[in-house]
Amino acid sequence: MENMFRLMGSEDSSDRRRCIWVNGPVIVGAGPSGLATAACLREEGVPFVVLERADCIASLWQKRTYDRIKLHLPKKVCQLPKMPFPEDYPEYPTKRQFIEYLESYANKFEITPQFNECVQSARYDETSGLWRIKTTSSSSSGSEMEYICRWLVVATGENAEKVVPEIDGLTTEFEGEVIHSCEYKSGEKYRGKSVLVVGCGNSGMEVSLDLANHNANASMVVRSSVHVLPREILGKSSFEISMMLMKWFPLWLVDKILLILAWLILGNLTKYGLKRPTMGPMELKIVSGKTPVLDIGAMEKIKSGEVEIVPGIKRFSRSHVELVDGQRLDLDAVVLATGYRSNVPSWLQENDLFSKNGFPKSPFPNAWKGKSGLYAAGFTRKGLAGASADAVNIAQDIGNVWREETKRQKMRTRVGHRRCISVA
């Protein structure tokens, strides 16, 4: 690539370390956040390199999502900068459609990531004023690289690593199948089987719905309170309605209106084992980042008894689970819909922008920029819209510096050229 230059290394096969200077920022992660940042940098005329540990873009969507998943929000709030979704796409694009959109996006902006490059560490070198990013190849070569650059964009996202809870007996005694929701594809293989879904977020609800649709005997563990909202209210998405209301009313009133509308549409959910938090859905989202569940059909299955809500787990044994209320359920499989976490602390050697939980210390919209050329894209807890906002800000910030320095370089070149002519 024209913006990468090999600095040192050996042709000897015993020396697998290569050092590469990147003339522009390095973006870690080729998901939607990384692609959006790359596209905006391309528009700014700034060269870049994208490092991706998988062998494809958007690996979370391509390899770690179930077949039936769709975008939970309308496409117009999920599109990336500079390129809308195709007009013939539905309001809530499918998994396949979203992947095709991202592939078209990468092609349009000529984004060609360095695949199978797993970042082991990234640190800022105070002496040189540059970032040093060490990677290993996940391919058979096992080669090692060190990328050196002035700017580093962390775009590995909020969902880089799965969260697997420690539950008594789950891995030591239970003999049935145990998978994380990132490994779940379809309920077809569980037809007629008893499956426990651990977790009641959007993934847990959707997996439970899919299991019920495939005639599995589905139970879902709900340990804590949860906000469930209809995905649409009077033909408009709950998200759009909440954003509109927040322009005119205080947050507490917006939450009150949303909860009244949810009660009118979904009814009283407490009798089904779903208690609401004391804090309203939008306030809770802003304060903690916890997203309300948008119902796409799971509540109907819960009300009909096709999906059973159960309390917390006490322990697992060979073929069943004992719950905290004394119930015992015979099980064939367990799906852990227990979410994901950021993996930034495992490789980024920095403590200014990011906190120990792998998220920026500052809240949105001020979480995209750190010191020494460090940036964060897609850690806003605001979904794709937040990632797009980060991408635009990052590209403009780097672009301003890039253009100014390019202008100065041209001026120095002109001055030097004139001196040469006068001497001649």
From Swiss-Prot:
Its cofactor is FAD. Keywords: Auxin biosynthesis, FAD, Flavoprotein, Monooxygenase, NADP, Oxidoreductase. FAD binds at residues 29-34. Coiled coil: none annotated. One of its GO terms (molecular function) is flavin adenine dinucleotide binding. Involved in auxin biosynthesis. Belongs to the set of redundant YUCCA genes probably responsible for auxin biosynthesis in roots. Belongs to the FMO family. This is Probable indole-3-pyruvate monooxygenase YUCCA5.
